[in-house]
Design a protein with these regions (language model features):
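Intrinsically disordered, low-complexity regulatory regions enriched in serine/threonine/proline
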Residues: 68-121
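N-terminal amphipathic/basic helix or basic patch
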Residues: 12-17, 105
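Ser/Thr-rich, low-complexity intrinsically disordered terminal regions
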Residues: 15-65, 79-84
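N-terminal "first-domain core" detector
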Residues: 1-11
């Protein structure tokens, strides 16, 4: 499921500042990066299953490995984890309404924090 129009996809920011803010909102980058791309995930464990709110991005300057990069974020996605196959983000997936609302709230809070660092740039 895509969360279109959140404004997150318009954010471009320094990787280190981005890592700090994403972590403060419960997103983990861990080893999910290469030299040009990053992926931040927030895990939701519920009775209905395990879900991930994912925000990906790509380097417009520098490289992620050196921790000196400027990242352009992409449209947030919500996916359901299926063991052992992985996470499905397809439009055919069904998500609990409470999860969708929680994800929207998280994205709104995140957007607010991201605006503070993009205003500095």
């Amino acid at each position: 499921m895509k969360f279109e129009g959140t404004g997150i996809e318009e954010v471009s920011a320094d990787l280190n500042k981005l890592d700090f803010i994403m972590e403060s909102e419960g997103f983990v980058r861990a080893d999910q990066w290469d030299y040009e791309r990053v992926t931040y995930d927030r895990k939701y464990s519920m009775v209905e299953g395990t879900f991930y709110l994912r925000i990906s991005g790509y380097a417009t300057e520098g490289d992620v490995g050196s921790k000196k990069a400027h990242i352009q974020l992409l449209t947030p996605l919500l996916g359901k984890h299926y063991y052992p196959h992985g996470v499905e983000y397809g439009e055919g997936e069904e998500f609990p309404k409470s999860l969708i609302q929680s994800s929207k709230k998280t994205l709104a809070q995140l957007k607010e924090k991201l605006e503070s660092i993009t205003a500095e740039a």
